[in-house]
A protein has these predicted regions:
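Short, extreme N-terminal segment that most often corresponds to the first beta-strand
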Residues: 1-37
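Surface patches in mature domains of proteins
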Residues: 34-48
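Charged interaction segments
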Residues: 45-179
């Protein structure tokens, strides 16, 4: 089994170039996507998706916070939009013109890393394209845990013990966005 990273971030669904869908269809599509991505082993959970209504679309966009379990790292989950998970690819292809902006922070305790990524997923000419806009990685330690906004030094010690006491681990995670 792969190591699992703890991930927090946002998905922004930009419908500016989606021509043939009503606002009701767009919201229904987001809810279907959230359901699909939330019911797998390496899930992505959008807690507010169920509460969306057509009036949730502002300036052709909807932004949702998410939490997830990354397969090794969350960039691997994002790659599934383009390749490797047919049901997800087919669903996304239904929304020709959509651009999804994904912004996240994560940490993984097996390989001891923190990462911050920005990706886009776009459907253009009936093809799903994934683009890495930025990716920053560093070692997970008390300093990066605090400076990347995952929590305080006290919280790090509570979760992991002193760096010298490793491998004490805790599954609790309360990340705060870097932005």
């Amino acid at each position: 089994m792969a190591n699992i990273s703890d991930v927090q971030g946002t998905y922004t669904f930009n419908f500016k170039n989606v021509k043939s869908k009503t606002d009701e269809e767009k919201i229904s599509w987001i809810k279907e996507l959230a359901e699909l991505m939330g019911n797998v082993g390496y899930n992505t959970s959008f807690e507010d998706a169920k509460r969306l209504t057509p009036s949730s679309i502002e300036d052709n966009e909807v932004t949702l916070s998410f939490s997830a379990s990354g397969r090794w790292a969350y960039r691997n989950n994002i790659a599934w939009f383009e390749d490797g998970w047919e049901e997800l690819t087919y669903l996304v292809e239904e929304m020709e013109g959509i651009v999804i902006y994904i912004d996240y922070n994560e940490y993984e305790t097996g390989c001891m890393f923190v990462a911050s990524g920005e990706f886009t997923v776009e459907v253009k000419d009936n093809k799903v394209l994934v683009e890495q806009c930025s990716l920053e990685e560093d070692k997970l330690n008390k300093e990066t845990f605090v400076s990347w906004g995952f929590g305080s030094a006290y919280e790090y010690d509570e979760m992991f013990g002193d760096d010298e006491e490793w491998p004490f681990r805790s599954s609790s995670f309360t990340a705060k966005s870097k932005k």
